[in-house]
């Protein structure tokens, strides 16, 4: 080892699979033919690395996982030979398999070596048979009996073989008889090497403490005279050794802690020391040239040592083959204006394939059927491919028509749009029409064919979009209950079923809402988002909702992306395993978010956490470590099942499986600090306290266990759990009733709140998730009757308990179960509304340094909103994704997915008081997602306005802006605006109609079938111009101006109501609008203000900006569509004291007597 030797490269050992964790290499070896370093792992995979940079070259699964780890790699001119406990495998250096040999007597192979015949190798191990294998033919040519268990082999003058008792046998290279034997070490030989006439060994011996430790001596033997030589002292413990390939008496000796020693065997005093930067060394190897040294450590890394100027693996290496470089096509000057005839066509003399005659087209075999994704977890490797149990989704002798379309029509046909129903309303008698939803969910096909279809309500549901957008879709077709469903067409919306389940667990719901009402403003707080979602679902009262903000927060977690929990990763894993992984992530993140505000986690632990301790005991030295083993989600562990005894054997009852899963005991390989190596360890959990909410992952990975669930009544509605001195007792059925009568101490009875199931109907191919929930548990009414509901995204319907808990259908599989303590039934806590932390409304919050905002004046404590306080609201949005439109062959267009918008600006104005009309919120929202269009001419948002580095506005995260609106909502404020339904949907907040005043519906004439734009209403009522055509694309709407105009229109409408002239005013507005096309006329310098029919007041115009008017959707469609939108019916409108008209003063910017002074007074 020269003076400039040092570590040149360090690489991690590649994981066994794309999503697996790295594991330490079990063996490493330098190739003696090419510049390659090879490594094997415990999963049977061998990987090669090229050159000093250790670039990955090939990676091959040489042995099945069931065969065990790769224990040795041997090289031949024709290829690379690897050995595992049960097989021998040979590949080319490019990774192509040459042969694979396994034998019934190959049970524990450890080592192999070349023999005197270079085309044969001998393999041996801790077994009574050795095998001679012909490398050229790939067959076993001889089987030899042996009385020794061999663990290492090295070829030199003799075949040196180490036994598992610490001896070394010198075997003849011809007949493999034992020529000489030495007792080299006390217990075992860890490593050895033989070259020319010398053999060096390292091993373990038992000292006075009784446990084996590394010997401080490396033993040396002369193979020429078959006699021992003086050993090499190595006080750090000689664990590994390699002989130098060129210097016959020089060897490398290494310790487990990384100390390297280069020593001359003939002169032990001449040594050279180095220290490798490793925590625990697992092996070394030296290259055939002697210029490189590889080190394998326990931290899953490979280190390469050598001289930077001289390093090479072989003296004469064969050139390593690499894939041919694909030639790049010549660049083309391609633009939208490039004519196609400039591209040109290649010259040809033969007939083109496109001219293939039709009479030569024949149908051959059908394409193979796609692999059922539900079988992936059950696949087992075989010699040829994999096999799995037959799911029996088709009848006997029935095959799949693979020539049919890959996507089947959904069983539940989408309803007609609301606009279509409105047009057809006059064609049919109302008595003859029956509720579409009742027909569909009762089993009648929507095409009129009365045919029972019990799978109808389990079908995939999809939202269809007309030219009027999502508002034209009839969600009530799918849900006529008071419980709201969740929409699809949102990234990661496959979690809808899990979110519904968590919402209906009262203790989880209370936890989320109390946290949302706290001081938390962390941008990525998942618990806050759950609180907002749960509040929205309750306020919606059966109207469809969407989890946009929560799923956006979920999508922002890098940990979730690394775990493959997002929708784009579902192609590689089953939906069932994905939602169970999401469940674990949600619970862990909830606990993390809760502790961010409340460091003491007693409340959380009492509700969700199983308090336990985990003991880890080494099976070799009996050393035991105890550590906390708390868990938020428990996975069911199933025993080995004989299905014939499943009904009679008590061990197969749900309660017993639950008990074994909670206090699980497993055996695994783990690191033992006392033994300083990986050993077999036993892991056992001791339970100290059970939570009030018990969430279980079904973990169905075995079709045999699936049959347990198909037993009627196997899943109980109630289970009892008692913890006594760390032991868990579970009861169900009559046994639970007996224990309740006996008043067993510490017994907690849990009732089933609901479960998430995977639905995989073969006819529809696309699996999805639904939830079955007992909604009575979270009801505020103390009703004793249980009512089960199916939540299939936005399809919600009541089902029988037996249907919810029945799993004897192959298309329905359980995923997640949720139990809650029966004492917490109806424990719905709304006290969070009384402890809302509203300090956010009274202080400035900014991401970009708290820049001064002249457009707003923050609320004071005296202006604290109270129920009924009016506030004017307007928002602006930018486009994050454009709409996805399908253009059909006839030229018609269908919206497949609407555009996705992001909230960019929120303006909220005072609606009453001295500072009426003055903004107290004017926030720009920073957006981390790519923005495809700022729509500046409509939104007024310019590039750079939402960037904290360049923005001149008050920037806040979406969480802060949303929480301000949520606080105003729950304080009882009344929101005044124009077109609020669209704004609320994009903001993702649910505002009850009683807290909404929308001027779009106030100024609506029932007989005119048209909604008026804010721009036209401003001119018609006040003769003012707003939203005028911008001079350039850098101008647009001003949300403060729009909100103030909506507030003024509402105030003026109240005056019309007080005077009793609403109908006359509306007639005049629509009469004038029909003449002008419902657009303000061009400016002429002077206009008249409409005060009452036939009366006019002259005033000067004010400036403003312009956007297109609301389009005339025409017909009865508009009238029908308005019934589902938030509105304020004039007949039912009751004005509180806070909603009284203005006193004629206005203290905001641009003051004027616009809020009063009406001639009507």
UniProtKB/Swiss-Prot annotation:
Membrane-spanning segments: none
Record-level Gene Ontology MF annotations: metal ion binding; nucleic acid binding; poly(A)-specific ribonuclease activity
Biased composition (Low complexity): 1116-1129
Region (Disordered): 1092-1161
Compositional bias per record (Polar residues), positions renumbered to this chain: 1097-1110
Keyword Cell inner membrane carried by entry: no
Activity control summary: Positively regulated by the regulatory subunit pan3.
GO biological process, one term: nuclear-transcribed mRNA poly(A) tail shortening
CC cofactor: a divalent metal cation
Entry's localization field: Cytoplasm
Quaternary structure and partners: Forms a heterotrimer with an asymmetric homodimer of the regulatory subunit pan3 to form the poly(A)-nuclease (PAN) deadenylation complex.
PANTHER family per the UniProt record, alphabetical: DEADENYLATION COMPLEX CATALYTIC SUBUNIT PAN2, PAN2-PAN3 DEADENYLATION COMPLEX CATALYTIC SUBUNIT PAN2
Role according to the record: Catalytic subunit of the poly(A)-nuclease (PAN) deadenylation complex, one of two cytoplasmic mRNA deadenylases involved in mRNA turnover. PAN specifically shortens poly(A) tails of RNA and the activity is stimulated by poly(A)-binding protein pab1. PAN deadenylation is followed by rapid degradation of the shortened mRNA tails by the CCR4-NOT complex. Deadenylated mRNAs are then degraded by two alternative mechanisms, namely exosome-mediated 3'-5' exonucleolytic degradation, or deadenylation-dependent mRNA decaping and subsequent 5'-3' exonucleolytic degradation by xrn1.
Protein name: PAN2-PAN3 deadenylation complex catalytic subunit pan2
Originating species: Neosartorya fischeri (strain ATCC 1020 / DSM 3700 / CBS 544.65 / FGSC A1164 / JCM 1740 / NRRL 181 / WB 181)
Encoding gene (name): pan2
